[in-house]
Amino acid sequence: LFQQKYSEAKVLLDEVITSGKYKLLDNYFDNFNAEQNNNAEVVWSNQVAVNVAGAGYDRSQRGFDLSYPNAPDQPNLSGAGFQQPTFDLVNAYQVDENGLPMIDTYADHEFKNDQDIESSEAWEPDMETPVDPRLDWVVGRRGVPYHDWGLHPGKAWIRDQVSAGPYNQKKWIILENQLATYAYDNTAKFNAMNFNIIRYAQVLLWAAECEVEVGNPEKAKEYVNMIRQRAKDGSYVRLGDEAPFGNGPAAANYKVDIYKDSWAGLSKDVLRKRVRFEERLELALEGHFFFDLVRWDIAEDFLNKYIEREKRHIQYLNGAVFDKNHRYYAIPLTEIDRSYVDGKPTLTQNPGY
C-alpha cells in the first residue's frame, strides 16, 4: 500500500476482511476504552499493563502521558498538555445538512471555540452547528464532558493556548472510574489502555483506497459507509449525571450519515478525497495522518495550505513552510558510515540533509 501497489495490497486486505476474525465494534469510543482492550476490532496493538505481575508505571501506556491535560485542579488526571488537536481538525468534523463531511469547504467555517477566553469568563459551546459525533470522542473542548472527569473548563486545562490552541486530546484518556483498576497509583497518565496500531476500521479504509484505484468505486463506498454507519448508530457524548454516557441530552448537535449517492462515474480525484477524508476523521490522533499524506504524495500541498489556515490563530506558524524534503528523516551519519562496501557507501543521504 505504501508503495502504491494497490492491486497487490487489495489481495492481502481482502484476506483480512473475509477471514471473519475482525469486526467493527458497535461504539467508536470502545476502541479507546481500557476495559475493551484486545477487542474484535483490534488487528495489532501495543500491549501494556499495570497492577499485575509486578507491573508498575514502567509497563504502562507511557506514550501519551505528556498529552494529558494540564489540569492543576485534577491531580489524578493532569499531565503536560501536549499533542493538542488543531483548529483545522476540529473544523473538519463539521457536516452539511445531510450529515456528510464538507471536504472542500470545511475550512471556510470556523467552529466556535474559546481561544483567548479565560475559564472564569462566561462562554457557551455551539449547540447548533451540526458536527460528526466522533468529534467529542476525539477532542476535549470547553463545555463538553471530558469523559467522566467533568465538563472541560477550557483555558484552565490548556498548557498555552497561544502555542497550540484551546483543545486537548481525548482519545487516550482513561475514565476516572477506571483509576483503581487501570491506572498506576491513581495516576491516569500511567494506565493500562493498549495502543491500537492497526484497527479493522483502518483495514476497511485501506481496502476502500484500493477499490478506488482498481476501479470498483461502489465497493469503496460500501467500506466507507460501514465506518460512517457505526458513527451514526453508536453512542454520542451525553450531558447529565452519567456523562458522557447515559440518556442525557447530546453535548452538541450531532449529525452523521452514510453516502447515498452513486460513486460510479465520479472522478478518481473525488473518490480519493472522500476516502482520505474519512481516514482523517476516523483515525485522528492515532499517529497515521502525516504518513498518509506522504504516501498519497500530497504532504507538501496539504501542509502548506494547513499552515496558511492555522496561522490565523497560531502566530508562530507565520513564515513556516513545509519542505518536501521533510517527508523523510535524515539517515544517521553513523549508519551511512557503516554501510561502506569496497570503499563506497551503500546508503546515501536523503535529499535536503
Regions found by a protein language model. Name each.
Residues 1-62, 66, 98-353:
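Acidic/polar-rich alpha-helix caps and helix-coil junctions
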Residues 62-94, 158-165:
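Short, cationic low-complexity segments
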